Amino acid sequence: MASPLPLLYLCLAALHLAGARDATPTEEHTSTARGLQGRPPDTGQPSPALEDWEEASEWTSWFNVDHPGGDGDFESLAAIRFYYGPARVCPRPLALEARTTDWALPAAMGERVHANPERGFWCLNREQPRGRRCSNYHVRFRCPLEAAWGAWGAWGLCSKSCGLGRRLRRRSCQSSSGDTCPGSPQEAQKCVRSRCPGCSSDTCGCPNHILLGSVVTPSGRPLSGARVSLRTRPGTIATSGTHGTFQVPGVCAGSKASVSAQMNGFSAGTAQAHANSSNTATVTIILEELGKPYLVKHPESRVREAGQNVTFCCKASGTPMPKKYSWFHNGTLLDRRQQGSGPHLELQGLHQAQAGEYHCKAWNEAGTVRSRAALLTILAPGQQACDPRPQEHLIKLPDDCGQPGGGPTYLDVGLCADTRCPGPVGSGPRCGDAGSRCCSVLRLESRDIRCSGYVLPVKVVAECGCRKCLPRRGLVRGRVVAADSGEPLRFARILLGRAPIGFTSYQGDFTIEVPPATERLVVTFVDPSGDFVDSVRVLPFDPRGAGVYHEIRALRKAAAVLLDAERGGEIPLGSTEEAPALGELVLPPGTFHHPDGRPYTGPVEARVTFVDPRDLASASAASSDLRFLDSAGELAPLRTYGMFAVDLRAPGSTEQLHVARADVHVDADHVRMPGHAEALALWSLDPETGLWEEEGSEQGSGGFRRETAAARVRREERAFLVGALTMRERRLFNLDVPERRRCFVKVRAYGTDRFAPAEQVQGVVVTLLNLEPAPGFTANPRAWGRFDSAVTGPNGACVPAFCDAEKPDAYTAFVTAALGGEELEAAPSRPRATAAVVGVAQPYLERLGYQRTDHDDPALKRTGFRLNLARPRAGHESEAHGPVYPWRRLRDCEDAPVTDSHFRFSRVEADKYEYDVVPFHEGAPASWTGDLLAWWPNPQEFRACFLKVRLQGPQEYMVRSHNAGGTHEATRGRLYGLRDTRSVRHPERPGASAACVEFKCGGMLFDQRQVDRTLVTVTPQGSCRRVAVNTLLQDYLARHPPLAAADDPAAFAMLAPLDALGHNYGVYTVTDQSPRLAKEIAIGRCFDGSSDGFSREMKADAGTAVTFQCREPPARPSLFQRLLENPSSALGDIRREMGQATRYSRVNQTQAGDTGPFGPGQ
């Protein structure tokens, strides 16, 4: 039976929409000629997305939650927050803009609509002119960037019933970006009541009165052993008992005494007693468990001119909330007397000596945490932050534009440096740079490239300068599937930290927009059916704004074991047919209780799910990234001996049971590495931070002790390591050892196996799995010890790993890379790894022992490699420049030039070519340039369109789409770009293949003034003719004129549809905030031939738009046969071919010294 939870949320969403429908026109502002509420747009001007607002604000992406139905079109803000998540729209939007799906304003449609930034947008059919119905609208909101205080609240009650006291009032910080507001959130004021009598209850007491109290956790669990005190009586006056209760005689019932409680491992709590009768008062004190601080906002890098001001901001959370901060400059602690100890660091009148790295540390009772470093760049007078001369950026030209007989030809189109510029007037006392500017394109120049039979237009960067930055939004998409069966996890709840942000789809898909200033993206997926363990993941993302795709594998819960609460039981950890159990979980009798502390007696269903590191495949289902906060507040890695999740419930109940104390026994034979038996500890995962916390560390009981078999009265003669833990909430436990021998491994991804620097690919997720030491070393019988992931940027990725300097093969690793659903291939190592191919200099390559997965067996996949993690040795020049870097040289690893040693991956899909007249780096959305010929007209929303072409023929064929302006006056007939794709064979039909060809979507161009239906011409590059066109697609094109000329039977031409048609038409459209993710998802649907599926296996007969019949050209007779049949003709052909070869050779020699604007292939 399906869980009712998803149905409940769908009902809530329906109520949101119903609430919008019930709204009347008189409730809110009504507009018949405006699509923007809060600031009316000028229809003759560009969209407000490109205007400079006086307020520090930005537009959200577009939303469309409703389609025109019986009553009209309703885009309520409540429904948008439900479907897209509350983080997608700020609490108080400044403005709202609405447009139809054809990008028309309501005024242009002549429709009466209602818009309010606080409620949303709606259009009612009954209010429209006769014969008209509401169009399908989508909306976006304008949200403030800068944090600001709200209005003060009302004054509270006086703290004293007599005499002198004080009262408080509070205000809240309103910020959509998570920034903090300067100043205090509360204000105090003195208040005077009537004079107190001479003898007060505080001094005289009430002998016949009694105070009854209890000490509990926020969930209601009683706490025993808490020390209780009164503010007027120093020292401990009582201690809470077994059920968390205590009694204090002599406290007057009406005194409203302030009672405090303290307990090891918990923050202090205070509460006020209230009279329960004439002589009895009661109080409940809530103690929160101490939580180490963690950063929710890190200081950000800034650029300033000498003499300007700058503000760095740091914000930490924890239990209790950290209030003490320390600031460091280049590792040196700044004077607190001058800079203070708050979360803001303000520097005024900057000079060159203040440039460098800044970081903060936050403290509370549980520990400390260190932020990442922010770089402050101070420009000298006259120094430019943005070089007006563009950097080199090579793009590959089509094959028929290259030199005869040469390799691929590249053209330098220029690229502006990815740097920040100082604001026009510096920075005030606020966290964010509201008017931040970046180095961007100021001017483009048009060039013409002569190719074989045609001229190729291109626009190159001519000048760079400082302009307003485009908003950068990290985006993570992916899919959650079962680790054992691959079935999607449908409607799983998604938590960002502890806050719910949405659900997975029916196919298990999800999309998460990374909040600003996020360092670690911690996401939890909760299965509504309860069949899977909660999956807590730290998802790598690209802070530059490129989208990243992840596949999450959820671990199915183990079968239930029935126990008796009064007898307890033992459950093995990791027992399989191939390997004995690593240990066991011992649940003592009489220790089970309800979450509120009530003892539980009766049967218990226990599910203990173990992630066994002896199984290499289990790494993909492991939670978190195995990190913890060390004593210095820095992230440090752990090495696992296994993870386990415990689920204890009464049969048929949904309430989870707790255990006051459980023991974990680990077989000592599995812990062989020196020092690990002493360092092994029990850890639990905090789902809010994704960090592991040592169990019992505050009492010093988190480690293991050694017990012999005799002491444990066991039959087998074995030694065990015994540790203890308390089971509460829904936590994952871990058997780990901290590891200090750490390094970074440099990895780059390329578009092809030529490994050209200009073809580096960003957004690739590189995963490194630390394996056990080689045979001959003191190793544990396990397959992996930890894992780590990183996302490639413009300069590759640096992945953390364990390493050893003395023994090269003491640590080994297995490395893979993936982009979306595609696995990349590693550089080959057969028959012998060479430096030129692998990318690592000798003799370091020999010491690393690089081997691709198919090194010993060519039949295996090529998607990974193994290596020895040999730490570079001092004094060895070949090891000083990668690919392995010591832990303290992370900056050297990140900034290493492409000529330094690194490991390489390349995309398998090499039979694909893309050309844009206005160059755009899809992995760096900030490189977008506003131009009418831009392939992507909107930098905040990328729409990818694909056409599925079926080809009947004996081989695979290249298919080209030529995309030019169709209906727009300024671009009609002008080229947008080219796309070449090789068809993929149907796995079961050798005579059929299909190609998913990208074309430029129809819609608004950069100026947002007029729609253009792109003229798309699809041509297979072979002897092919068009034999069929999808009937629905032909019907649609006929009903939406004008029609494109279709005279050429060897091609298919159309004016791109404005609607997202779907698989029934053979057209696949996906809109996303990342161009790469939009294309990856659209290609997966195109391969599958469905509008909601995803496949990497081509289904050539499903969901096609047009079909071509191709045939092989007649084979040319051999030279011997031609000489026999027609000697004179054959000799003439040979002379002509030799003459052409001679001319090509002379041309190459002439152009060898001067290549003009063309760069050589690399």
From Swiss-Prot:
Tagged with keyword Mitochondrion: no
Main location (coarse class): secreted
Region (Disordered): 23-51
Keyword annotations from UniProtKB, A to Z: Cleavage on pair of basic residues, Disulfide bond, Extracellular matrix, Glycoprotein, Immunoglobulin domain, Secreted, Signal
Matching InterPro entries: Carb-bd-like_fold, CILP-1/2_8th, CILP-1/2_b-sand_dom2, CILP-1/2_C, CILP-1/2_dom, CILP1/CILP2, Ig-like_dom, Ig-like_dom_sf
Domain TSP type-1 per the UniProt entry, residue ranges: 146-197
Signal sequence region: 1-20
Disulfide bridge positions per record: 158-191, 162-196, 173-181, 314-360
Residues with attached carbohydrate: 330
PTM annotation, UniProt: May be cleaved into 2 chains possibly by a furin-like protease upon or preceding secretion. N-glycosylated.
Tissue expression notes: Expressed in articulated and meniscal cartilage (at protein level). Also detected in heart, skeletal muscle and brain. Not detected in growth plate cartilage.
Domain annotation Ig-like C2-type: ranges: 293-377
Localization annotation: Secreted, Extracellular space, Extracellular matrix
Any one GO CC term of the record: extracellular region
MF annotations from Gene Ontology: carbohydrate binding
Protein function: May play a role in cartilage scaffolding.
UniProt name for this protein: Cartilage intermediate layer protein 2
Organism of this sequence: Mus musculus
